[in-house]
């Protein structure tokens, strides 16, 4: 499936059919604001700009009308090949962005990387295209035995980009290391296999008055059946949609409450005082631990339980390179299942008082997890039977406890090494 982006306020492109792709996945933008996606069948041949306009209007006419109504402008009745004629000076979305950029908060972008130098290079290059004046980038290398990540940062020759090493494997450890050296009022996290939109930071800054901002994660490409299937399952954004929203502890909740129904660690930002308030990322959760993930989910939950708000801002979107094979997708879904139940154990450990609420919600949660809307639902296509729903979830609690034991052992070994070094130092300086 070919991935393309269309700006509706410009003349629409013609789409040629060369046999390489049978379908087209289109992201539509209206004065740079992403407003929706749709899938277009190409098997019938080329599409003229007018034909593409008709298809997009059928899929997104309502979203277009909503934006025009918000701007107090009469909505168009169709989308032609010439695009929409709208004066940008009177467009609220652009006016809000301009106001934010008058006094932009300083943002620290933390990229945790592990053995993906080519993807990291693309991510760093895309960050250099940001339409935002006040930011730094901190690359945290979780595999510092190689020089690839360090060399990529050095090659940029840009003082805004810094390299730091975190030799202890684990995404949470890398995140915590990045936070510890960040200078920004806001700390944003990006994965090394993602490419942020050029307005990503500007959109994050729109929500800088809340505790946390999270945005869309869209596909960078859909070249394989596994990538298409993952996106059809909801992708990283779980069909959150293209409408901004603010969530709080007092608002509507998901059947898996207090697990939030949104957000992913590959696209999230926190105010510095929020991170101080809720604490460090749990080092027994996340990639590189037996729990495989969920450190981001726990962080979102702690923000909400602290009485702070989380903004969902779809304009703050990034493009992600999904796993290309069913084997990789299977590992990913298995990790979601393990992480889900590990998350609940971690939450009870951090906030024991939630246990009563969890017990009351258990019947609804079980029904939800058995439905197609579940975040850990198994697709029917081509996945190994040993990764059937439920098996990973049963492993989650034990996986989290293993992570705690591993951390304790690692900390003890570090203490012992430190003690031996101090002893040798004293011996060398005695007498």
What annotation goes with each model-predicted range?
Residues 1, 6-22, 27-31, 36, ...:
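N-proximal low-complexity "stem/linker" segments adjacent to membrane-targeting elements
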Residues 22, 199-236:
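Conserved donor NDP-sugar-binding/catalytic core segment of glycosyltransferases
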Residues 124-165:
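Acidic donor-binding segment of Leloir-type glycosyltransferases
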Residues 233-260:
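Short, flexible, basic/aromatic active-site loop/helix in glycosyltransferases
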Residues 263-266, 287-299:
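Acidic donor-binding loop at a coil-to-helix junction in glycosyltransferase catalytic cores
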Residues 332-338, 352-431:
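Non-catalytic, C-terminal membrane-associated alpha-helical segments of glycosyltransferases
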């Amino acid at each position: 499936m070919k991935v393309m982006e269309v700006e509706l306020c410009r003349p629409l492109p013609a789409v040629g059919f060369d046999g390489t792709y049978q379908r087209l996945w289109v992201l539509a933008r209206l004065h740079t604001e992403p407003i929706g996606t749709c899938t277009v069948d190409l098997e019938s041949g080329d599409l003229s700009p007018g034909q593409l306009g008709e298809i997009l209007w059928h899929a997104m006419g309502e979203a277009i009308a909503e934006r025009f109504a918000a701007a107090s402008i009469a909505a168009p009745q169709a989308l032609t090949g010439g695009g929409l004629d709208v004066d940008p000076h009177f467009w609220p979305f652009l006016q809000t962005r301009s106001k934010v950029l008058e006094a932009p908060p300083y943002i620290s972008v933390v990229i945790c990387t592990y053995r993906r130098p080519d993807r990291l290079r693309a991510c760093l290059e895309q960050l250099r295209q940001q339409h935002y004046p006040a930011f730094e980038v901190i690359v945290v290398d979780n595999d510092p035995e190689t020089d690839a990540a360090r060399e990529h940062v050095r090659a940029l020759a840009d003082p805004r980009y810094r390299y730091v090493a975190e030799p202890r494997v684990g995404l949470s450890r890398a995140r915590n290391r990045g936070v510890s050296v960040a200078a920004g009022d806001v700390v944003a996290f990006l994965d090394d296999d993602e490419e942020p939109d050029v307005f990503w930071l500007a959109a994050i800054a729109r929500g800088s008055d809340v505790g946390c901002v999270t945005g869309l994660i869209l596909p960078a490409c859909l070249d394989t059946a596994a990538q298409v299937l993952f996106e059809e399952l909801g992708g990283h954004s779980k069909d959150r949609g293209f409408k901004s929203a603010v969530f709080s502890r007092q608002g509507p909740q998901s059947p898996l409450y207090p697990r939030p129904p949104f957000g992913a660690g590959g696209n999230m930002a926190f105010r510095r005082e929020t991170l101080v308030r809720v604490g460090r990322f749990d080092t027994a959760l996340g990639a590189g631990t037996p729990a495989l993930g969920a450190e981001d989910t726990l962080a979102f939950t702690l923000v909400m339980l602290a009485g702070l708000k989380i903004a969902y801002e779809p304009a703050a979107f990034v493009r992600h390179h999904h796993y290309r094979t069913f084997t990789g997708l299977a590992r990913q879904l298995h990790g979601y299942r393990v992480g889900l139940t590990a998350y609940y154990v971690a939450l009870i450990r951090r906030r024991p008082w939630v246990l009563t609420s969890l017990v009351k919600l258990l019947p609804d949660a079980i029904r939800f997890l058995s439905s197609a809307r579940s975040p850990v639902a198994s697709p029917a296509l081509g996945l190994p039977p040993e990764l059937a729903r439920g098996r990973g979830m049963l492993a989650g609690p034990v996986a989290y406890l293993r992570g705690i034991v591993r951390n304790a052992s690692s900390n003890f070994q570090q203490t012992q090494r430190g003690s031996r070094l101090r002893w040798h130092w004293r011996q060398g300086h005695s007498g």
